[in-house]
Amino acid sequence: MSAVSISAVKSDFFTVEAIAVTHHRTPHPPHFPSLRFPLSLKSPPATSLNLVAGSKLLHFSRRLPSIKCSYTPSLDLSEEQFTKFKKASEKGNLVPLFRCVFSDHLTPILAYRCLVKEDDRDAPSFLFESVEPGSQSSNIGRYSVVGAQPTIEIVAKGNVVTVMDHGASLRTEEEVDDPMMVPQKIMEEWNPQGIDELPEAFCGGWVGYFSYDTVRYVEKKKLPFSNAPEDDRSLPDVNLGLYDDVIVFDHVEKKAYVIHWVRIDKDRSVEENFREGMNRLESLTSRIQDQKPPKMPTGFIKLRTQLFGPKLEKSTMTSEAYKEAVVEAKEHILAGDIFQIVLSQRFERRTFADPFEIYRALRIVNPSPYMAYLQVRGCILVASSPEILLRSKNRKITNRPLAGTVRRGKTPKEDLMLEKELLSDEKQCAEHIMLVDLGRNDVGKVSKPGSVEVKKLKDIEWFSHVMHISSTVVGELLDHLTSWDALRAVLPVGTVSGAPKVKAMELIDELEVTRRGPYSGGFGGISFNGDMDIALALRTMVFPTNTRYDTLYSYKHPQRRREWIAHIQAGAGIVADSNPDDEHRECENKAAALARAIDLAESSFLEAPEFTTITPHINNI
């Protein structure tokens, strides 16, 4: 039969090219030994495999950056690769192993469902995606990241911190002044060894959220927990999971990195550490390459009709109460106590759509740079945030306030006209500059003298339905500080609190009736090496999981659904000339815009196809 020899010729991609064709006969199918693609820290030896397919003998090879493949007749990896792992383990105590696979058969949505079953909504896990804004259209971000089964969980409520070490089967509880010191101290014990082949994305570490009330660990005297509004949900203030296993999708190069971080156990041999790490990696890879992957509901989408879900009438504040709070805030502004304050209220929407279905719909309704589906203890977060809270990479910190908003135009010409109008709006530009100054002050607290600068002032960022005025503030972290110190300095940002920030937050405690929880805090990841990428928790729905409802709903299919309550919080920036009616309407519009994802999920996944209609157009988010 014919044999085709194929080899990879392009670095970074799994590409193949036909080299030669020969003819020979194979009387009996050969026996194939088990195959393991070698993983390395730098440059592994070559590995290849001959396969008989029909009447052709195929020779496959693959290449990553500086990686070659060769035939390996056993599960043992090469001496060269093992030597490199051994050297890395001598330098540090965290060493990543990875496997690169084709991603053309897999999506981040499907990969998440392979790791977390549909009925396991209490399992800590996450899916991070990104859509980069563009002038005419948005482009999908290069990387998506999926993770499940954290080895350690940290849950803080007030000053009580619970640490669940699943690897050691230990659960501890202690009272501390600052719960963020707990993960910070754990990280001080690490010495991670990076490798060049891994992508420029989050590849493992802490994932979770920091609530708005995290600021009370820093401003203990002016913003004590005792002065906080009613805590009607009892959600954790800090909720983190440590993920040794992640899957990173590279949408540009059409491949996925399956990554496992090996914790070097000094009481075990290097061989044992290496073998256990490879077994964990093999197990993780097999879970996303299941012969029978989970079936995802297809959904039916009919856009641009006029069918919407129920109006968001239930809120933590009546319209009259919110307007009275606006009037009182204006009195403080006129008295010179503050310049601006952001007052929010929390709306409620009941639904039989599953939060994961709502996340899938949100990707269509409101694609944004920080898309997140995050399951943690006590709640599920479904987020579509446009704004960085803090980015820290190689000790360079970035804060990018977004303030000043106008809708997108229906045509490119109208877009340009609206952009000029936005930049000519003195009120919105003045508010933006005030918040940029606040950002400079926050970044300056933890930066080297002279390193703080505004790189982009009053830039315009285009999103799916709106455009924002954006500025970028950068600084270089002081030598004796870490990313955690930078997070303490900026959380929460002025765009969700006001200016001066602490005084505005004192008034928020007086004027808002319930705690904000995750809203206006931050969510994201802290890498093993200390880099941090935290998004501002705006346009974020919170689904409490610690409350169960007896209501079940049965559709034409046999699946029975539980009822969920979505908490959608939105705020408005109050200044001296604010109109209470307009500010209340702004909160309603922002919340209703996010609720369009629930409308789409209900019509796509719950109703019959012929009734599936929804309009995702949003004028102002």
UniProtKB/Swiss-Prot annotation:
Signal sequence residues: none
Transit peptide: give start and end.
1-87
Query: Which terms under GO biological process does the entry name?
Result: L-tryptophan biosynthetic process
Q: Which SUPFAM superfamilies does this chain map to?
A: ADC synthase (SSF56322)
| E.C. number(s) listed in UniProt | 4.1.3.27
Regulation of its activity: Feedback inhibition by tryptophan.
Task: Describe the function of this protein.
Answer: Part of a heterotetrameric complex that catalyzes the two-step biosynthesis of anthranilate, an intermediate in the biosynthesis of L-tryptophan. In the first step, the glutamine-binding beta subunit of anthranilate synthase (AS) provides the glutamine amidotransferase activity which generates ammonia as a substrate that, along with chorismate, is used in the second step, catalyzed by the large alpha subunit of AS to produce anthranilate.
Recorded protein name is: Anthranilate synthase alpha subunit 2, chloroplastic
Source species, please?
A: Arabidopsis thaliana
Which classification does the entry list for the species? Eukaryota, Viridiplantae, Streptophyta, Embryophyta, Tracheophyta
